[in-house]
Amino acid sequence: IGSLSLYRRCVKKILPGEGSLRRLRIEISNTIDVSEGALAPRALLVGVGGTARAALKLARHYYKMSDDCRSMTAEQLDGLCAFLCGGKKEASDLILRLEAERIHTLIPGMLILQHVFRLFKAQQLVVSKYGVREGYLCQRILKNNTDTPKTGS
């Protein structure tokens, strides 16, 4: 499930209204269809990707957290989601100020994140500084460096 495809299927305007939020939540539940108790609880989740980093950036600002903070709690995520989904101008202003390029996908992505939190009964999200692409690239570079023959001096 991706936040952009979810946005395209469920949201009619730039930011989701009540009807769109309902459609988003139903679509997320239907797509990530896991029966209650099927997953072992995990207190800690690790977020790798742009949505997780953007959510953390907004949480830092909204909750006045330090710039070097790399995590947020379930309560903070729920509070931030409630604020962003509340339909107030301050919410869209915050997104536009901090993550304008994610204006369409941030709320759908955060609702996915919130759903995953609930499935695992997670208490905290730690957000990686780097995404999957960076990790793959580093792995390829490091692997190539170890395969390179060394010249003697």
Where do the PLM segments sit?
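Helical "lid/coupling" subdomains associated with nucleotide-phosphate turnover
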Residues: I1-S153
